[in-house]
């Protein structure tokens, strides 16, 4: 009993002192080689939102979704071979999530000094992601977002904790996820299909998505 207590105290001390094993970013980068086929090398996603942006996403959100794919509690057939059959370990999930969360995509084209070669310029430009503005009533979108969405997703849409970043994400991808929530094909947190989204009109959702495209420049 005394030994067990001492061991527990030792573990607690190590955790407090920061000795918990950190994510292996090199391993995460290696795993991303598989993800890049759909989501691109820098995690921008692709095919105009058929594959979502995952770069800069909240680490806890990425971890949770990968575990959901692996357990098949979130249905996404293209993801099954990479999570279930490959048997993505908890450690792998931790590593790839940390790697992706650390990728920063600018919302403005880089300023070149004139000393860069062509390859360097190309690599710099590839780390830029600008979501086209979508149409909608920005004032209404801001009002609804700040009142009903910001509490979880943050005032600037960057997300927090297990709640995902929305700003900088493809508009048609976000709309597709909203549709899945409303149909009950994807649970919205613990609400199921009952909650904020069900109380919004289609025009309100359009306005919120338009508002999100208008504030991406603040993501610096």
Q: Which residues fall in each region the model found?
A:
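Bacterial N-terminal signal peptides
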Residues: 8-17
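Electrostatic cytochrome c docking/interface patches
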Residues: 18-32, 45-50, 113-144, 162, ...
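Bacterial N-terminal signal peptides that target proteins for export
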Residues: 1-9
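Axial heme c-ligation environment in periplasmic c-type cytochrome domains
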Residues: 47-55, 68-114, 160-165, 182-220
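Terminal helix-turn-helix DNA-binding modules in bacterial transcription factors
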Residues: 177
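Short pre-active-site segment immediately N-terminal to redox-active cysteine/selenocysteine motifs
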Residues: 24, 31-34, 42, 58, ...
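The feature marks the first
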Residues: 29-72
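The canonical Cys-X-X-Cys-His
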Residues: 33-41, 96, 141, 148-155, ...
